[in-house]
Each structure stands twice: as structure tokens, then as C-alpha cells.
Amino acid sequence: MAAPLKGFLETTSDLWLSGAMIDKPAAVFASASSLHGGHEAVLQSMMTPLLHHGMLVMGCPYSDPGLAMTEGGGTPYGPTHLDADSLRPHEEAMAHRLGQRLAKWSQHV
């Protein structure tokens, strides 16, 4: 996880203690400089504090066609971008679909 994000999350103790984020939907996304550059580990490290907050973390279901692509980013934990190149169409589409799911569930809370 990037240091600025970690620093921000460390300032959310009051929200955690008050339970203000419980049942709020959340999702994560990331980029890495190589295909096996730790995409999953980065996403999981970002999910941990969200789960501690009691948030409802969603990822990309295996029905997402982007997960079948092997030449770029994308994991069940969230969309990723292989930043060695420009954004690939399937990476952008996965991020858009996850954003749509997040927006849909946000209307219910």
C-alpha cells in the first residue's frame, strides 16, 4: 500500500471507534509495474483496514470477462493496471464495472 494512503487510513481511528463506517460499501484498485508485481498483495493490504472498519468490501466476480485476460491487470480482489503501458480496454472496463456495482450497493445504505 502506498505510504500516503496508509497515512490517511491511520487518521481514521475516530471513525473506527465510533463505528461510522460499518456497513458502508467499499472497493479497492491498484497499479503495479510488472504483471506479477504484487497486485493481489497490495489490494489485500488495502482491504484489511476497511474490514476493520466493518465496511462491506466488494471485488470483481469471476463472471467479469476481464479476469480471463492474462496480458494486463485484474484480480478478483479488484481492478488493477499494469502501468508499464497505457490503460488496456479490459482494465478500464473492469474498473468501470466495479464502480457500477459499488454505486448500486451504495444506494442501499
For each predicted feature, which ranges?
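Helix-loop-strand module that forms the ligand-binding subsite of alpha/beta enzymes
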Residues: M1-P65
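Glycine-rich phosphate/pyrophosphate-binding loop and the adjoining helix
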Residues: L56-V109
